[in-house]
């Protein structure tokens, strides 16, 4: 999406060139081959949907086939992401280096500065979130979801029952990458910048905090935790910009110690108490 938005700038950039501004600044003479086609939204959309899933499928196939799991799987994924982050920081990779891709002007001909465009992107994001939730809920409630839960709990017993756990894990891993690609495509035009620092391990840790705060083992909990943490981050960065990370850490530790089931656990507790009163 960032590449499409950069190509949409055209000659409205600082250097009035068909090349993105950072390429002109670095004295690039022509567009790299892997940028071809990204001036078309249809090709960009296809890449958004296909490339993350394809990359995840290839990586997941070899990782799951080698029976890498648990903390070792987490380490290897973080190490690979960190290596890619360092690669994208290089100016010669053609993705803007440290500054990344920014100064986006429009999407599909609509100015990104217009309130109507911002609202449209927000509504599209909300719709995609809702559809993703429905899809995830359907999977969880289906036979596929029950098998995935069993694999999570005791994979060896699932294998002894005759299931090929590789296929199940590979499917859900690829699906998650597919959804992440869509989320990233919606994130970039609304934030206005994308650079390699977005690939740092801290972002993965923050997502784990979202789930822990909202409630592990639930779909709504992840959404609730993401909303709460980002609101808290926005408030803390303004109120205490030098200490907001400490506040975030205290919040995470407090929830882990006193609310092991997250915020969803509070609602479950109240609902169970109400049921007991009715009985």
Feature map (PLM): residue ranges:
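Transmembrane alpha-helices and adjacent helix-loop boundaries
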Residues: 1-279
